[in-house]
Amino acid sequence: WNRPFVSIYEPSTKKEPSAIQSVSYFDAEGAGLEDFAGICVKSKNGRIDHIFSLSDAAQTATYQGMKVKADYAVISNEYAGNRTLFLGNGTQLVAPGVMIQTDNAANVLLEKKEGKWYIISSAPCTVVIGDKKIKSDASSEHILLRI
């Protein structure tokens, strides 16, 4: 199987019911994108995740101001002072107020937790948050970004 796909798994019980409010699909904007899968997951706590899956990390998918050049990416909105952005085997992720760029395909997790930004990256990368540009080395542990 070499087509892009996205699956949503969420264990839940009667004591811990589902946190997902809705799941919808979206298509990348523009022409020329061969294989793409896009899912929008809305959670009951206000978090919204846009999940991008491409068959070719050299291609670029755009949707509502978001831009991804990767095999896989997750872009969340900001909710309760938190936000998650993940670039999977890619070189670029652009979202409102944030940009991640690498020279070579990498995995980058950029998280905002209680108002503070943290990063884990498999390769050196450049991150732009608002008007602040930060260069980050590869790290397997969370690094606090000084913003």
Label the predicted regions.
Residues W1-R3, E10-I147:
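Non-catalytic terminal regions with compositionally biased, polar/charged low complexity
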